[in-house]
Regions:
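An N-terminal hydrophobic leader/cap segment in hydrolases
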Residues: 1-38
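Membrane-embedded segments
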Residues: 40-120, 137, 143
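Alpha/beta-hydrolase fold nucleophile elbow
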Residues: 121-133
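Short beta-strand/loop motif that positions the catalytic acidic residue
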Residues: 189-191, 196-198, 202
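Conserved alpha/beta-hydrolase "acid-adjacent" motif
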Residues: 203-209
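Catalytic active-site module of serine/aspartate enzymes centered on a nucleophile-bearing elbow/loop
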Residues: 236-251
Length: 251
């Protein structure tokens, strides 16, 4: 009875631990402006945007759990300083946005972000897709729909089923988790160059997830960072490594 009760608790409460959505609303940082992303299912989502300087690519960023537009600004400070276009996506149900978080909902949010860039005549081959943690799931989903220039995954998981199953191994998570974000099954289908970064001290998503994703991807480079934890995405060293990798691709 206790086992069944705990399984039911995980099933019915999973949105709370998969999507711990902060509600703080942040003003755009200098150089950014607030814009609206209109989703196909009728939501108007606030995002932050800075246009690219002439000849520079544009990066679309999907932040991690408990993240925000303010944090995403810090995660991409180096790119903004170098003149890249940057679109910081805020999900449905996060940061004062309407809607309820879900994998399919986040997919629609990502599509709205790419549509926003298309409206501004930004070519797919000038777009870099980037995701941290839970944002890696939407980044991978978008990489399968957009022929972008590159994909960057920071502290990604193979799937939420794998991740939660590692932390609570006594339950059949494949039957319980309804938001799988199955990066491992999808990433090999991505046609663009892929960079996976992970910290060796990540206690939230173990580095084994990043290694597994990199091993499965035909065009994937893996970078490990000794002693860095799950929030390595804010680290200037990590951002510099991203920029160096992009420069090698001519981006």
């Amino acid at each position: 009875v206790v086992y069944v009760g705990l399984a039911a608790l995980i099933y019915f409460q999973q949105s709370r631990f998969i999507f711990p959505a902060p509600q703080e609303v942040y003003a755009p940082a200098p150089g950014y402006q607030a814009v609206t992303l209109n989703t196909a299912d009728g939501l108007a989502l606030t995002a932050h945007w800075r246009a690219p300087e002439d000849g520079k690519p544009t990066l679309v960023h999907f932040h991690g759990n408990s993240g925000s537009l303010s944090g995403a600004t810090s995660e991409n400070r180096l790119f903004a300083d170098q003149g890249y276009g940057v679109l910081l996506v805020e999900y449905r149900g996060y940061g004062g946005n309407p809607g309820k978080p879900s994998e399919e909902g986040f997919r629609e949010d990502g599509r709205a972000a790419l549509a926003f860039l298309k409206e501004r005549a930004i070519a797919p081959k000038s777009i870099i897709i980037k995701g941290h943690s839970i944002g890696s799931g939407t980044a991978v989903n978008m990489a399968l729909e957009q022929d972008a220039a590159a994909l960057i995954l920071v502290a990604p998981f193979t799937s939420t089923v794998d991740l939660v199953g590692q932390k609570i191994p006594i339950f059949p998570m494949g039957l319980i988790i309804t938001e799988p974000f199955d990066n491992r099954a999808k990433l090999p289908q991505a046609a663009m160059p892929v960079l996976v970064q992970h910290g060796t001290a990540d206690a939230v998503v173990p580095i084994s997830h990043g290694r597994a994703l990199a091993a499965d991807g035909p065009t994937t480079e893996f970078q490990s960072f000794a002693g860095k934890e799950h929030d390595l995405t804010f680290d200037p060293e990590v951002q510099t490594a991203q920029a160096r990798w992009l420069a090698e691709l001519g981006l």
